[in-house]
From Swiss-Prot:
<dbReference type="GO" id="GO:0004170">
    <property type="term" value="F:dUTP diphosphatase activity"/>
</dbReference>
<dbReference type="GO" id="GO:0000287">
    <property type="term" value="F:magnesium ion binding"/>
</dbReference>
<dbReference type="GO" id="GO:0006226">
    <property type="term" value="P:dUMP biosynthetic process"/>
</dbReference>
<keyword id="KW-0479">Metal-binding</keyword>
<keyword id="KW-0546">Nucleotide metabolism</keyword>
<comment type="function">
    <text>This enzyme is involved in nucleotide metabolism: it produces dUMP, the immediate precursor of thymidine nucleotides and it decreases the intracellular concentration of dUTP so that uracil cannot be incorporated into DNA.</text>
</comment>
<keyword id="KW-0378">Hydrolase</keyword>
<dbReference type="Pfam" id="PF00692">
    <property type="entry name" value="dUTPase"/>
</dbReference>
<comment type="similarity">
    <text>Belongs to the dUTPase family.</text>
</comment>
<comment type="pathway">
    <text>Pyrimidine metabolism; dUMP biosynthesis; dUMP from dCTP (dUTP route): step 2/2.</text>
</comment>
<feature type="binding site">
    <location>
        <position position="89"/>
    </location>
    <ligand>
        <name>substrate</name>
    </ligand>
</feature>
<dbReference type="InterPro" id="IPR036157">
    <property type="entry name" value="dUTPase-like_sf"/>
</dbReference>
<feature type="binding site">
    <location>
        <begin position="76"/>
        <end position="78"/>
    </location>
    <ligand>
        <name>substrate</name>
    </ligand>
</feature>
<dbReference type="InterPro" id="IPR033704">
    <property type="entry name" value="dUTPase_trimeric"/>
</dbReference>
<feature type="binding site">
    <location>
        <begin position="93"/>
        <end position="95"/>
    </location>
    <ligand>
        <name>substrate</name>
    </ligand>
</feature>
<keyword id="KW-0460">Magnesium</keyword>
<dbReference type="GO" id="GO:0046081">
    <property type="term" value="P:dUTP catabolic process"/>
</dbReference>
């Protein structure tokens, strides 16, 4: 169930020249957590991503993420499953004080070249609350049952 706030945060966008004609980022279903981001590549020159290659793709927009929130750029499950296309540095964080064009770092982990055309939905962005912790240095870590065990220490 999606929780609807009385006053959801407002996401202001600035459309850049390379974003002209592209749809605004949008939630594709009523319960969608992420809004789809589209490729702002040149319409006359689609980008071909060969297996093993990566590319930084423009979205054509500057996002003003509200203070106290972040934008999390994540892969689209269909592109990942069907073609091996994913976002590196996932989730990528768009901080609330960043004012440049949002770009998506895509990688082709599949076995075939993948063509990215203008307006194609390439990733999704989730707007999420941020907590900044107070950082303090201590002399020793507190004891726990788990201790320093990691990387499979609780079972696989």
């Amino acid at each position: 169930m999606t929780i609807h706030h009385d006053t959801p945060p407002t996401l202001n966008l600035i459309r850049l020249a390379n974003g002209e004609g592209l749809d605004l980022p949008a939630y594709e279903s009523k319960g969608a957590a992420g809004m789809d981001l589209r490729a702002a590549v040149d319409g006359d020159a689609p980008l071909t991503l060969a297996p093993g290659e990566r590319a930084l793709l423009p979205t054509g927009f500057i996002f003003e993420i509200p203070e106290g929130f972040e934008g999390q750029v994540r892969p689209r499950s269909g592109l990942a499953f069907k073609h091996g296309i994913t976002c590196l540095n996932s989730p990528g964080t768009v901080d609330s004080d960043y004012r440049g064009e949002v770009k998506v770092l895509l990688a082709n982990l599949g076995e075939e070249a993948f063509v990215i055309e203008r307006g194609m939905r390439i990733a999704q962005m989730v707007i999420a609350p941020v907590t900044q912790a107070r950082v303090t240095e201590i002399a020793a870590a507190s004891e726990t049952a788990r201790g320093a065990g990691g990387f499979g220490s609780t079972g696989v």
